[in-house]
Design a protein with these regions (language model features):
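Charge-biased low-complexity segments
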Residues: 1-97
Length: 97
């Protein structure tokens, strides 16, 4: 997972990107997706996920993943110089590999 430059990175419930990846995969169960998908999103100051972009799968699959990520449980927001800030995140998930 790559982030904008911040001192404290946002974290998914459970604290790891592995938990986030597993959560997305669980939500996609039965979708028969394979390949790599790039997911970009912003974690806002309240821990909500906004501005989701998904690339790498077909439109229908991208839209489904986008909705799953958009409605993910709140994250712990990122911080910079002691202030809670919006942070742009990017990760690649591998399905069926």
């Amino acid at each position: 997972m790559s982030y904008e430059s911040v001192q404290v990175k946002p974290t998914f419930k459970g604290g790891t990107i592995t938990k986030f990846a597993q959560w997305v995969e669980d939500m996609m169960e039965g979708s028969n997706v394979s390949g790599n998908v790039i997911i970009e999103f912003t974690v806002n100051v309240y821990g909500g996920v906004r501005n989701v972009v998904v690339k790498g799968a077909g439109k229908k699959t991208n839209d489904k993943i986008m909705n799953i990520v958009r409605f993910s449980p709140n994250w712990a927001p990122g911080k910079n110089r002691g202030k809670v800030v919006h942070v742009r995140c990017r990760t690649t998930l591998s399905f069926g590999n």
